Every structure is written in structure tokens, then in C-alpha cells.
């Protein structure tokens, strides 16, 4: 009770993503770590958030996963659960000296590693030993309610296993839909991203309820039966545009020479483990001569060489005909260049048009604002004093200065730090994610988007800051008045690197012809541990052919 670990508890806040919490609990249990849950909301005097903020009077919701640090493996628990481990000043001084002298580093591995951020689960650290009103933690018991006479059956889209459920049913040639807006049917709440299977879509499928129940049992996933398709009030009804039909993905991974065996392996593992469906591997050496028509989705893992002209031309034509191309890390950077595929660019290639990218960023931010001057909207007199996003009082930097800064700041890129990602809450690729997503960031490309290119995840979370009386210029972007930007969550992230990647895009999507190109700045399945951003990747892989491309009609 007198150790440095005695008065500390780690809390994974209650979430409907039972599959992900169960996966974390299994790993903790394998180490003999004791876990508990609260049977009622629990108020604590203070807690530290994953963004490092100290909050007072925090209420821990019922059903949270609580891990007291006061138990036999206390040092291990702290090592794998604490949000932000300190690095000695002497180490930081030597690290910075090395970076500036010759670009070398003391850091041989990622400097940020804790379970809650890797798994993308919201959590807090409570500076006290929690033991009252708790009981041993048990995984949620699935309720498989499959009525044979129901008109439809659904699983919760907040749970990662819902993606596997959809993928496996489509492997059986069952028609599957996904809901892109939350609704209530038959008194049952259906979240965004919920998988929806109807009897009407599958009139010739024998034993449909039995197949649904069997797959749910395999995944230990709850299923709800729906008896009425009328949404409560103005909520979506079955038959409306929000119940979107999926297409069965036919997946290939580029591999062999020129690709990272780590990323190829973790991509392969993610498909096998999280989805359990078939896929193919294509030798990149034969890409320009391969028949790509059999695939609807191609994944390009992190690679060490850019694709050649004939290879790019083959992929470009395939995308235009309706393919979904997903690329990681350096492979994504090789596509995001002049002569690549699409119009997304890396920061270094976009600074000549910095103001255009900043205006696109401001439009995104304004699109989420709920502030409105009703008097200005309702006036009959023309008001010439219109506020424009490029006229906030801050002075933009010249292209020359931006390039000079980018060259300098790129020296300080991390070896593996956690940064805060803000998520587009309306995009189909963000099913099952919150508004903030921890991102593992290293020496990797930072992307820029504008016009019709979409940023599903950007770096940095805006928070209210009453002291920020003026807009602030951060390299190419502008932070609005009254806002502050939080970037670092955990690990070593030099201020120069934080400024460089602030507001850049981590996940992008661009429509090209009938198909789409989806770029991930990093490796979304890093060592099989980044479950948060991994969910975005699973959405792209399984839902992309149905939600992001034009349907193919075979006559």
C-alpha cells in the first residue's frame, strides 16, 4: 500500500464495442492480471484523460473495465497501461543532439506503447485504489435473438465483430446491408454501421435464420430480430437510402519482393484473424500482366520501391472500372505524387498551394460548427462584412518559408509516438469509432487533401481555449480563434514534428472513375495491435466495394 503503484487504477470506459474490450481482457487475463467492473456509475474526485488533461468529478459509467495497479504484477501493469511514460532528460538531450548532428537516434522502437491507445479504447487513469462497489469482470454474454418469422436481423455496428459477420455472410452469397445513420426499429436501437440482413433481400436462401444464428455463435456476437421497418419519428425506415446494400469483396494483397514482410504479414494476419475470409496474394512482379478483374479490392502494404509505369497504369485502369485500392505508408506516398494515382499529395509536394489546403481544412471545421448568427441570416439588408475562412487575422507563411520549415521539421519525425486523430463522424469508414482515435505515428508520409478528396482522419483534436483571442498560423494551416490543438498523446514527439503533422490527413479517400483510392499514412495493422485504426481499415476493406464504388451490372 506504500508503493508508487498503490494508489492508481486504470479504467477502460464502458463501450458497446464488446469484441474489442474482450480481446484486451483476454490478454490481461493471460498475464494473471485481476480485472473488475462497477455495477453502478462511480464518481471519482479526479482522473487523467488520454490527452493528459486533469478532470475533476469524473463519473465512471457502469460496466467499465477497472484494473487496480495495487496487485502482484504492479510494475507490469503500469508498463502496459500507463498513458505517458516519462523519458529521462539526459536521454532526451542525447537523442536531440544525435538527430541534429547526423540524423541518428537512440530510439530503436516505438516510444509509445499502452493497451488502451493501441486498442483505440477510451480510458482514464484514476489516482486512487478503486475497490468499492466492484465485482470481478466477466465478458458480456451475447444474446442471439433470431426469430424465424422476423423481417430482418441486425448486429451492432459499434462492435468490431460486426464487420466479420457481414463479410462471412457475403462469402455465403447472402445479401447484406449496413445502416449509415442510427435509428430505432421495433423498439431496438441500431447504431451507425449496424449490419442488417433482410428476408426480402434473400428470398432464395434456405435456412437464412439458421445461417445468421450460426455465424453469430461463431463470433459470440449478439443478434436482434426486427419485426417492423418503421423508424421512430424522423429516423430512417427500412427501404430508405440509409440502408445501403454491400458488395462481396474479393481481396488481393500485393506481396513478395519490394514490400515490408512485417506489413504484409500483419495485413494477412488481420484478414485471417479478424475476418476469417478468403483472400489472394499477388506477386507484384507480375502485376502489369495479371488479370485484375477478379478482384474488387487490392491492398498495397508498405513498400520499399515505387511501382513502375506499367504497374501504375494497370492499377489506374482497374480503379477507374470500380476497384478499391488501399495503400499503406510508403506505398501510399508513392501513389500520392505527380504521376501516381489520384490527387492526394504529401506535405512536401503541396506547399505551393498551401492556402487552398487551409481553406479546405477550414471548410471541414466550419461544417461541424453549431454556431449560427440568426440575426444575420434573417436580415433583409445586405451585410458586406462577411467572414471568410482565409481572413481570420493570422498571416499565412510564404511557400518558401513553408518549405524551409518542412525541411527542418522533417528531421524530428518520431520513431513511434501516439498522436490524437480527429475522425469524420459521418463517413462510412468511421463506423465503430469515436470522435477521437489514437494514431501510432513514426517517420511516415503526412497527406494533404482538398476539393473532392476526403480526410476521414486528421491529426489533432481541437479544444475550446478562451485565451486564444486570435487565430494562429501553424505552418500551412490555421487554428481558429478560441481553439487550441492537442496533438501528442504518448511517447516522444518533438514540437517540430508535432507542428509538421498537425492537421495533416492520416486516412484519405478519393473517388476515381467508378472506383476509389484509400490511403493510410501509417501501417493500420502494426504488429496486429492497433485495433482502433485497424477498424477503419476493416471498414475500407469490407464495406468499400459496396459503399464507395459504383455498382457493377453483369448481364
List the predicted regions and their residue ranges.
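Intrinsic-disorder/low-complexity accessory segments
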Residues: 1-555
Amino acid at each position: 500500500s506504500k508503493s508508487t503503484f498503490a494508489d492508481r487504477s486504470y479504467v477502460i470506459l464502458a463501450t458497446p464495442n464488446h469484441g474489442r474490450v474482450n480481446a484486451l481482457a483476454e490478454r490481461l487475463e493471460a498475464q494473471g492480471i485481476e480485472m473488475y467492473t462497477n455495477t453502478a456509475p462511480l464518481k471519482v474526485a479526479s482522473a487523467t484523460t488520454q490527452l493528459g488533461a486533469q478532470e475533476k468529478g469524473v463519473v465512471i459509467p457502469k460496466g467499465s473495465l477497472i484494473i487496480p495497479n495495487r496487485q502482484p504484477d504492479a510494475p507490469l501493469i503500469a508498463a502496459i497501461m500507463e498513458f505517458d511514460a516519462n523519458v529521462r532528460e539526459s536521454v532526451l538531450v542525447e537523442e536531440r543532439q544525435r538527430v541534429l548532428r547526423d540524423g541518428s537516434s537512440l530510439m530503436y522502437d516505438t516510444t509509445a506503447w499502452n493497451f488502451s491507445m493501441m486498442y483505440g479504447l477510451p480510458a482514464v487513469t484514476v489516482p486512487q485504489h478503486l475497490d468499492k462497489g466492484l465485482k470481478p469482470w466477466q465478458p458480456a454474454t451475447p444474446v442471439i435473438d433470431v426469430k424465424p418469422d422476423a423481417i430482418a436481423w441486425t448486429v451492432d455496428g459499434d462492435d468490431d465483430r460486426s464487420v466479420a459477420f457481414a463479410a462471412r455472410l457475403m462469402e455465403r452469397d447472402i445479401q447484406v446491408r449496413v445502416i449509415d445513420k442510427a435509428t430505432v426499429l421495433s423498439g431496438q436501437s441500431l447504431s451507425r454501421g449496424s449490419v442488417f440482413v433482410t428476408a426480402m433481400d434473400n428470398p432464395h436462401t434456405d435456412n437464412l435464420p439458421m445461417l445468421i444464428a450460426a455465424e453469430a455463435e461463431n463470433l459470440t456476437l449478439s443478434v436482434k430480430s426486427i419485426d417492423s421497418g418503421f423508424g421512430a419519428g424522423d429516423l430512417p425506415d427500412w427501404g430508405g437510402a440509409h440502408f445501403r446494400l454491400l458488395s462481396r469483396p474479393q481481396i488481393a494483397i500485393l506481396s513478395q519482393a519490394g514490400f515490408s514482410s512485417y506489413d504484409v504479414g500483419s495485413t494477412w494476419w488481420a484478414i485471417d484473424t479478424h475476418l476469417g475470409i478468403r483472400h489472394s496474394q499477388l506477386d507484384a512482379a507480375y502485376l502489369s500482366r495479371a488479370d485484375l478483374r477478379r478482384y474488387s479490392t487490392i491492398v498495397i502494404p508498405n513498400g520499399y520501391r515505387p511501382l513502375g509505369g506499367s504497374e501504375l497504369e494497370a492499377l489506374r485502369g482497374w480503379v477507374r472500372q470500380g476497384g478499391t485500392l488501399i495503400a499503406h505508408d510508403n506505398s501510399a506516398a508513392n501513389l500520392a505524387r505527380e504521376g501516381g494515382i489520384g490527387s492526394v499529395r504529401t506535405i512536401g509536394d503541396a506547399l505551393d498551394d498551401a492556402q487552398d489546403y487551409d481553406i479546405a481544412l477550414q471548410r471541414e471545421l466550419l461544417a461541424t460548427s453549431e454556431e449560427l448568427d440568426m440575426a444575420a441570416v434573417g436580415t433583409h439588408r445586405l451585410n458586406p462584412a462577411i467572414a471568410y475562412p482565409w481572413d481570420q487575422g493570422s498571416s499565412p507563411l510564404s511557400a518558401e518559408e513553408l518549405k524551409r520549415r518542412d525541411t527542418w521539421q522533417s528531421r524530428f519525425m518520431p520513431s513511434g509516438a501516439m498522436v490524437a486523430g480527429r475522425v469524420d463522424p459521418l463517413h462510412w469508414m468511421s463506423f465503430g469509432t469515436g470522435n477521437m482515435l489514437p494514431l501510432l505515428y513514426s517517420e511516415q508520409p503526412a497527406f494533404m487533401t482538398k476539393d473532392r478528396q476526403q480526410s476521414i482522419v486528421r491529426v489533432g483534436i481541437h479544444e475550446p481555449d478562451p485565451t486564444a483571442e486570435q487565430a494562429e498560423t501553424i505552418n500551412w494551416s490555421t487554428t481558429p480563434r478560441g481553439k487550441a490543438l492537442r496533438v501528442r498523446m504518448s511517447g516522444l514527439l518533438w514540437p517540430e514534428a508535432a507542428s509538421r503533422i498537425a492537421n495533416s490527413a492520416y486516412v484519405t479517400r478519393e473517388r476515381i472513375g467508378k472506383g476509389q483510392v484509400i490511403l493510410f499514412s501509417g501501417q493500420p495493422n502494426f504488429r496486429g495491435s492497433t485495433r482502433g485504426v485497424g477498424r477503419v481499415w476493416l471498414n475500407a476493406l469490407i464495406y468499400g466495394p459496396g459503399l464507395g464504388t459504383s455498382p457493377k451490372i453483369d448481364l
